[in-house]
Amino acid sequence: GLFEGYELKLNSYDLGVDIELNDIVQRMRFEHPEVKVVVMQSGKDKVFSAGANIRMLGAASHSHKVNFCKFTNETRNAYEAAEADSGQKYIAAIKGACAGGGYELALACNYIMLTDDSSSAVGLPEVPLLAVLPGTGGLTRITDKRKMRRDLADIFCSIEEGVKGKRAKDWRLVDEVIANSKFDQTVQERALEFAAASDKAGVSQGIELGPLERQITDDGIVYEHINVTLDRSYRRAEITLKGPSTPAPADMAQLQAQGDQAYLLKLCRELEDAILHLRFNEMDLGLWVFKSQGDGAAFL
């Protein structure tokens, strides 16, 4: 884990896992635009994901938990929107227990497949087990996205053991239930079908995302296109966006040739990194001030 007091088990996750997942989603979008279908599955037997690590949540401060849930939601939203934004459809292939944040992770996928065996079930047990509501979109997605009846949603959220097999399909919790003996083959077939039906344009070459260069000091962070100045006495962070120093690319070929050094791409990556740093390492800074500098004509 990121701090003492917990150990990641049963495919549970913490902020570190979600940072890796967010990085993967962005790399699928930019480095592998030829990919049309992404299958999300577990590398462990008998468990898909147990969700957010309970001991981590118990040991974390309130502000850490709030920012953790926000970042987790943003990551879920990113791959949920990937089909519309970048033509990549995400499939959740569930074998084993899929509970709490683990099921919320699957709910953000565009298609959910569940194997039909004695150990595979989906559930949101936060209310009966922890007396809290699901924190990363579970209730919203089962009713608004999957169109589950609200009375069934109430029952579902009160069941500790979750819902299996045909009932999960009947309650609209999953899109497809497959016999365990045919599950892996069916997942492969469905992925190929979705890829064949995709109207995403064929792209053979992506943009490799290299590591960001930054310098962290006691009173700020310096990137190529962003400066972050920390004023802890006033609990304020000043984020300065610097304009481009070279003309914009004339066409897509020039933009692709610039790779991860293209101004807008690098600026957005640096800004995302700076915001993540401020959220979790400078939580006492309650005011962020955004400024810009540079030649306005260079943006046009």
Say what each PLM segment does.
Residues 45, 112-113, 119, 127-129, ...:
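Short, glycine-/Ser/Thr-/acidic-enriched flexible segments
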Residues 63-203:
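Conserved catalytic cores of soluble enzyme domains
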Residues 14-63, 73-93, 115-118, 236-239, ...:
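A structural preference for short, pocket-lining loop segments at secondary-structure junctions
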Residues 2-7, 81-88, 252:
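Short helix/loop segment immediately N-terminal to the Walker
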Residues 5-11, 55-62, 254-261:
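Short glycine-enriched, charge-decorated loop/helix-capping segments at active-site entrances
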Residues 1, 104-108, 147-259, 263, ...:
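Amphipathic alpha-helical segments at domain termini/boundaries
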Residues 7-16, 242:
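Asp/Glu-centered strand-loop micro-motifs enriched in Gly/Pro and often flanked by an aromatic residue
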Residues 1-2, 47-51, 123, 132, ...:
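Short acidic/His/Gly/Ser-rich catalytic and metal-binding motifs that mark active-site loops
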